[in-house]
Design a protein with these regions (language model features):
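Conserved SAM-binding loop of SAM-dependent methyltransferases across substrates and taxa
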Residues: 171-181
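Conserved acidic carboxylate
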Residues: 187
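Class I S-adenosyl-L-methionine
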Residues: 1-161, 165, 184
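Class I SAM-dependent methyltransferase "Motif I" SAM/SAH-binding loop
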Residues: 166-170
């Protein structure tokens, strides 16, 4: 079954991770809840860090034919092996931005949240795969380079190893290479 397939790979991933290593698992609504229980069993509930909601598209076309709520997001579960090692990323404040009280902003910018958008309207935090984009491969579980760059940036440094057990078209390896990470891709 699918859970056995996942269990075998997740146990190997846990054993390969360094103490400050992390794991990100992309799932849709069909399997996310089963996989969360499995990950809690393998990594320990205390090592669950965050559920990231990735809005995957716009509500249009065939999606509107759904008989109930229209699905418009996938989930990425974020776990650590033992110690959290995380590089926080910020979206810079727009030029000329001032706070409500009239003072200039403090800090590096807007901290990226755990809901990642794919909307052209929300330029601030948009990670999208456009329908006719060259980056679109046709894989149902495709992640674009911006999404993978965000994950790899937050979890690794130059020279670290990135592993993808479901490498598909190889986008994870391409992004890891551009970011000067080592990578292992399995399909």
């Amino acid at each position: 079954t699918w859970l056995t397939f996942m269990k075998n790979r997740l146990e190997i991933a846990r054993d390969l991770l360094s103490p400050d290593g992390s794991l990100y698992v992309h799932l849709d609504f069909n399997e996310v809840h089963y996989c969360k229980v499995l990950l809690d069993e393998i990594f320990g509930r205390g090592n669950f860090q965050r559920e990231i909601v990735w809005r995957i598209g716009w509500v249009s076309g065939y999606k509107t034919a759904a008989k109930n709520w229209i699905r418009n997001h996938d989930t990425i579960l974020f776990y650590t092996r033992q110690n959290l090692s995380f590089t926080k990323e910020y979206i810079p404040y727009p030029e000329g931005y001032v706070r409500r009280d009239g003072n200039p902003p403090e800090g590096e910018g807007y901290a990226i949240e755990d809901t990642w958008n794919c909307s052209e309207i929300d330029k601030l935090d948009s990670i999208q795969i456009k329908s006719f984009d060259q980056e679109k491969t046709g894989f149902l579980t495709q992640k674009n380079e911006a999404l993978l760059r965000r994950i790899i940036f937050s979890a690794t440094g130059e020279g670290d190893i990135v592993l993808d057990f479901c490498a598909g078209s190889g986008t994870t390896g391409a992004v890891a290479h551009k970011m000067k990470r080592q990578y292992i891709m399995v399909e």
